[in-house]
């Protein structure tokens, strides 16, 4: 039994939760065939994802230092040579791995590498990849992991319908779990029907309503296998440019988001997606000052308009798109104060120290840290990480 469960066994009632978590979260298949697209648009029912695990998370947090809590806020770009020391010294919430990390590896070797890290971490680590399929594949591009790389969900759906989509998505989830990966940063919930859009080849290339139904199915497939998924890139990419290399300013109306972009996110949330990843686009109709991932107003949309109670993840704060939008201080500090729970970063130690200093200087309320950490740990318990 994993380390966090060993901690929980000693706590009254918590052990009971450990035995029933799968039935509660994944045992009941959602009948997506009954999805009414008007309901997708109008449904505003709040679903509390991890509330039953908050007491367990709070008990664990009582024994955590401030340093450990701050570390839990970060999903760190993986570096094999530094990962062990980071776990020992800075207590990260987890790592995000990229294609280079799977080169010259096998299923067994990467599993052993991840297991070794898990064994020295007090709190189980999130191990994430972007294995969307098609244009973005980190794992299946290598023949040691799969004979051929996964195609995009769109390609599978276009050629084999829902049956093939379900088969390949569940195969993907099973493969990732077998290697020690517990979070797939997918599916792409963006709406695009224009082949010239930067994001188009990663989408279903369908209108908002059809995309919403398919996204709901994708979330359900992942949940049935038991891997965490993540809707991206909230609040919707549209026809914007690549934010890995520059900022994208979205001039669309608020009504456009309500009537289109929000629909797939709403359906994913209705199907109990545990995490949502926020983009670096500037959404002028919501917040013309900050990229979405650093915007308290955008995060409020996700929490209050879409009633999302799960983990909010930033896109990588080391991307060019956020540079220049933080005049004084740190992008990580702004992200925490904006309501993000988990910060993806390629500059971990620097951002960790900035957040620690901000708490010391009372620029971040410790209650804000505690709220995010409690949600992150409750998520880890719920998904048996």
What role is predicted for each listed range?
Residues 3-127, 131-141:
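N-terminal hydrophobic targeting/anchoring segments and the immediately downstream early-domain regions
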Residues 71-72, 93, 122-127, 181-182, ...:
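Short, well-ordered coil/turn segments that N-cap beta-strands
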Residues 86-87, 117, 176, 222, ...:
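Generic structural signal for hydrophobic
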Residues 89-211, 233, 238-251, 279-294, ...:
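Enzymes and membrane/adaptor proteins characterized by extended Gly/Ser/Thr/Asp/Glu-rich
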Residues 117-127, 206-227, 292-313:
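Alpha-helix-loop-beta-strand connector modules within alpha/beta enzyme cores
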Residues 249-259:
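Extracellular glycoside hydrolase catalytic/binding regions
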Residues 360-385:
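Mid-to-C-terminal alpha-helical segments outside catalytic/metal-binding sites
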């Amino acid at each position: 039994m994993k380390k966090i469960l060993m901690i929980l066994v000693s706590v009254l009632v918590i052990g009971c939760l450990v035995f029933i978590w799968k039935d509660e979260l994944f045992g009941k298949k959602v009948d997506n065939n009954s999805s009414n697209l008007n309901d997708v648009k109008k449904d505003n029912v709040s679903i509390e994802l991890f509330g039953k695990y908050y007491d367990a998370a709070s008990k664990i947090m009582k024994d955590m230092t401030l340093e450990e809590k701050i570390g839990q806020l970060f999903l760190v770009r993986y570096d094999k040579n530094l990962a062990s020391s980071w776990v020992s010294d800075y207590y990260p919430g987890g790592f995000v791995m990229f294609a280079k990390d799977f080169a010259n590896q096998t299923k067994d070797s990467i599993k052993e590498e991840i297991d070794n890290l898990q064994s020295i971490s007090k709190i189980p680590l999130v191990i994430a990849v972007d294995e969307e399929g098609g244009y973005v594949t980190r794992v299946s591009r290598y023949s040691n992991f799969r004979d051929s790389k996964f195609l995009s969900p769109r390609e599978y759906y276009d050629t084999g319908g829902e049956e093939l989509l379900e088969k390949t998505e569940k195969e993907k989830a099973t493969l990732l779990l077998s290697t020690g990966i517990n979070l797939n940063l997918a599916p792409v919930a963006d709406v695009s029907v224009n082949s010239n859009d930067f994001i188009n080849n990663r989408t279903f290339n369908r209108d908002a309503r059809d995309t919403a139904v398919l996204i709901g199915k994708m979330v359900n497939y992942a949940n049935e296998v038991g891997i965490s998924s993540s809707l991206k890139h909230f609040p919707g990419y549209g026809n914007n440019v690549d934010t890995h290399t520059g900022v994208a300013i979205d001039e669309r109306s608020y009504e456009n988001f309500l009537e289109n972009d929000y629909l797939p996110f709403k359906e994913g949330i209705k199907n109990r997606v545990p995490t949502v990843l926020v983009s670096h686009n500037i959404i002028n109709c919501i917040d013309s000052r900050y990229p979405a991932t650093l915007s308290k107003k955008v995060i409020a949309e996700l929490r209050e308009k879409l009633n999302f109670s799960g983990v909010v993840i930033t896109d990588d704060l080391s991307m060019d798109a956020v540079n220049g939008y933080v005049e004084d201080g740190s992008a990580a500090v702004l992200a925490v104060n904006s309501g993000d729970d988990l910060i993806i970063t390629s500059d971990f130690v620097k951002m960790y120290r900035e957040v620690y200093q901000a708490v010391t200087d009372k620029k971040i309320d410790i209650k804000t840290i505690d709220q995010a950490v409690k949600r992150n740990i409750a998520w880890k318990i719920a998904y048996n990480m």
